[in-house]
Regions:
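Structural motif
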Residues: 19, 154-167
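N-proximal short alpha-helices
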Residues: 2, 6, 158, 169, ...
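ATP-dependent adenylate-handling active sites, centered on carboxylate activation for C-N bond formation
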Residues: 1-141, 182-205
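A short, charged helix-loop
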Residues: 139-152
């Protein structure tokens, strides 16, 4: 019941659609915390800095197995498998998406975004034609620029380090830090992120 009561207030907190369901529990935790303190510490950044997500390792294993197959062959197989209606969802659909990855960074995004990867790529080609006209009028949309353009990829020798860097440059500021700051400030709770201290980041890298 507490969670449902938060939903009508989400638009006030974020000012725009924000597709992270943990925004609700984060708000509730912040609200309880604010009853006792005015400043709190967040552990965000630890997984991205010290390779704490299992996905970093699993994607590396999958990539090492699939990269031996020529990309055109993988891409064709991905399209053929994904075209079958009965495999649009579930494990087989996920494998089809991963097969179509051109780089390990692309594969990581496909694993995290899921079916949304096709929309992300379509945005750059069609000028977001899939977005309802009402949203185009409310929010200006810059055609030809997608999340795929934010990170050049392959900057670091260790594959997992590239995935960690992707999260630090995109997922962390655009999702995690945004979510924590907005939900906490909605109850007048300030947050500090010691893991993102300059010295900690330099030590991690």
């Amino acid at each position: 019941e507490d969670a449902r009561q938060v939903i009508p207030h989400l638009a006030d907190m974020f000012g725009e659609p924000f597709a992270d369901s943990s925004q609700i529990p984060t708000y509730l935790v912040s609200k309880i915390t604010r009853e006792h303190v005015t400043v709190s510490l967040s552990g965000d950044g630890g997984d991205e800095l010290f390779c704490g997500y299992n996905t970093y390792y699993s994607i590396d294993r999958i990539w090492n197995k699939t990269k031996r197959i020529p990309f055109p062959v993988r891409k064709m197989a991905s399209v053929m498998i994904g075209a079958a209606g009965e495999v649009r969802h579930g494990g087989l659909a996920t494998r089809a998406r991963l097969l179509g990855a051109e780089t390990i960074e692309d594969m990581y995004l496909r694993s995290e975004i899921g079916e949304g990867i096709s929309l992300v790529k379509k945005q750059g080609k069609t000028g977001a034609a899939w977005i309802p006209d009402v949203w185009k009028e409310i929010l200006p949309w810059e055609a030809g620029h997608t999340i795929m353009d934010e990170y050049p990829g392959g900057l670091l020798e260790v594959p997992q380090h590239n995935l960690m860097l992707m999260d630090l440059l995109m997922y962390h500021p655009d999702d995690i830090l945004n979510k924590v700051d907005r939900t906490a400030m909605a109850v007048s709770l300030e947050t500090r992120v010691p893991m993102l201290d300059k010295d900690v980041i330099e030590f991690a890298w």
